Structures are given as C-alpha cells and as structure tokens.
Amino acid sequence: SVPGYSAEAQSMMPHAWTSGTQVQLLRSKVLNMKKGGTFVMVPPPNPYRCPPGPYERVSMIAHLLKERNPTAKIIILDPKAKFSKQGLFMAGWEKHYPGMIEWLDPDTHGGIKNINVATMEFETDLDTFKADAASVVPAQRAGSIAMAAGVNDGDWCPINPANMSAKADSNIYVLGDASVASAMPKSGFSANSQAKVAANHIRGELTG
C-alpha cells in the first residue's frame, strides 16, 4: 500500500506494529538520530487495528526526543484526511512538544509516490522528505487463517452483527480486528464486546 516499501524494508523502517524486536529496533533508530534530525511516520489507511495507535506512537517518540534530541522534528505523512481523537492529540502535541510535530494530510502532501529505503527519502507531490529514522505502517488485512477459511470478502470478513457469525459461513465466528463490524473500531474493547455476543449466541444454540 506504500510504493517502495516491502517486507525487506522493515529492518530500515520498522512498522513495530507487533511487540518485541521491531519495537526495540525502532527505539534504537530513534535514539541514534543525529541532533536536529527528522523522524518520518507513515500511518496506515483505514481500517486498521487500534485507530489511535500511530499517534500514540508519535507522542511517545516526541517524549523521547524532547529529552534526548529536543531540536529533532517529526513529520507525519498521513494517507487519511483525519484520524482518531485528532483534536486531543494535536492539542497535546502543541502543549507538550511545540514546533516538533508536523502532521500532513493527503490534500497537503499529495500522496506518497515512492519511498527510497536506501536513501531514507519519501517522495510526495509536495516535497521529498529525507528521514534520519522512520516508521512505516502499511495497510492491514485479516489474518491468513481467515483467507484459508474463505470467510473474507477482500481484506476483511463481513459478519452478521447479531451474533458475529461470518456471512460466508454461519458456523464460523469472526471477532475483533478481522471482522467488518459496521462502525465499531478495531479495538480491544470492541473485540471483548463481540466475544460476549458470540459466546451468548453459541450458548443459546447449544442449550436451546
């Protein structure tokens, strides 16, 4: 979903969307930025797991840079025109990290045309941004088990909202991030609520 980005690029521009070595790698790259350097963040397009996640990450990186590299800059090249809890995040950034974070929506940057991983350059219609460290989170989709089960329609799995069963197979229940659950965000709270709906339905089916 991001031209020029690939699985091989993860070592240079970690997505760090899973815990463990990717997160450690990203932290190391941020700490090793030159003084006054630039960090570039590319969030994923909708829908994706944990809508506030990329912006929480930016906040954490800004906190780290404020202590270790206060003249550094963070540029967010967002594929979305707006994001979750935007007003709160932008007010917090202005209060705690004034002048450090610049959020650019697609109308401003015109879209990412290419990423040169070797030179750490992000080409957009607006400009070419050179990063000293970067995190790219590409578009997401349901896991391979959903594809293997044949309950997906494209990248995600349509469900019957009354009981969370898959529209493609009522004997299979799809919960959480993989499901297309109307306006419910792909969050832990949503998954927990959906699990209770599915469990109650299954219990009803078993007990009559």
What are these regions (language model features)?
Residues 2-35, 129-193, 204:
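FAD-site-proximal beta/loop scaffold in flavoenzymes
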Residues 22-72:
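Rossmann-like NAD(P)H-binding beta-loop-alpha module
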Residues 44, 79-81, 177:
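Cofactor-binding loop segments of dinucleotide-utilizing enzymes, especially the Rossmann-like FAD-
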Residues 52-56, 87-88, 186:
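Generic recognition of short, well-ordered alpha-helical segments
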Residues 63-155:
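A Rossmann-like FAD-binding core segment of flavoenzymes
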Residues 197:
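Acidic, glycine-rich loop-and-strand cores that form catalytic or ligand-binding grooves
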Residues 202-208:
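C-terminal, flexible cofactor-proximal segment of oxidoreductases
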